[in-house]
Amino acid sequence: VNDKKPAPKRGNNKPSVQNNAVERPGLSARQCAARLLGAVIEKNTSLDGLTDNSHGHPQYLALEPRDRALVRAILGASLRNRGAIERAISKRLDRPLPENAVALKHLLHVAVAQIFYLNLPDHSAVDLAVEAANADPRNRKYAGLVNALLRRLSRNKERALAHTLLPEGNVPEWFAKSIVDAYGAEKAAAIFAMHAYEPPIDFTVKSDPELWAEKLGGIALPNGSVRVQTVEGALTDLPGFAEGDWWVQDVAASLPARLMGDINGKRVADLCAAPGGKTAQLVQQGADVTALDMSENRLKRLRGNLERLGYEAKTVATNLMDFAPEELFDAVLLDAPCSSTGTVRRHPDVPWTKTPQDITKLADLQGKLLAHAATLVKPGGVIVFSNCSLHPLEGEEMARKAAENPLLEPFPITVDDCAGLEGLITSEGYLRSTPADLPPERFNGDPHRAGMDGFFAARFKRRA
């Protein structure tokens, strides 16, 4: 982004926000970032929805692709380091900002995220923040404060960073407490530390992982996934995309479909299937797959993904609770809707858009879905339940409660089911991963290549 155009003369205080955005490249991106940060923090709006390239926020859609990428980078840094940024700001203020200066707080967070965490000129972050303040009637009177505060932080960046919070301070207090309660202080600290880094990209490949690791410039993981730290350019330009030789899927997300046993030639249902990564795995394992999802649009995406891979599956757009097939399945996979708290590395808005009440409601829904899933399987058939939540209410506690269902017999997962990642199997026979698994020590200390999504899986058999 070219941020070097001279600022308007002091006497020119009449241009609208829109005119300023035209006059000063980079301004509209910063204004958009502050606006979207407010939507996440104040209204619990999903960042994915706000930055969707088809249906996102109008202010975001009005930007050029390069500025959209900048907005996403700013928001990622702002949310991953929210507590650290807040502390850095508050320590350098003589008095707290007024409670109603909400727009100002978002503007400052966006600017400090650039100064501390992005490879952008500090002076651009400062100048554009001041200009954005002047362009907004709510913030105009604080323009001098914005200028002084940000210049002070940019001059003493290293000192400011050294005094910021520990990683657990970058998520809401309830979220931090729930993770500490579930995993203990040491494991929780490792999880929070991994939240600070964008995740690498994992691929599920159809053939030789070592070969594809070489072709894609990555490494083969113990389970056969291929990991690449970053991809320059579009995924669609990578070797093997057009040929359907691989699909993107976090290593943790690839594990539940591998717990089904021998499903070659068997009828298997993927009950919450879109976007289709697990569906593709089931087809790859030789199953006759029926993929369900409530959303026809999401199923359309799934069918497109399978078509690229050269795979086929029956698709059914329906609410799972209404699904009553004429013939029962040999096995079902229920990757249930959840709080997604295991995906904070790739979705840093999750701690701010989810609440404890959401987790309770989702756990209740999961219990109902799992109970119904049990009715869709032949006696002796396998049911795998999974989700990408870190919270025991949606995982271990859910599985223990499900075991009380007279149709569900626990079928413990063993180390043989998870070759190479045996440490993820718990003493109760569940699969539990966290972002702290596959730690940096396994990658020469590099956190950018480490970690995995938080996932839970439990396996059952249908009682006769």
Each PLM stretch: what is its role?
Residues V1-A464:
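S-adenosylmethionine
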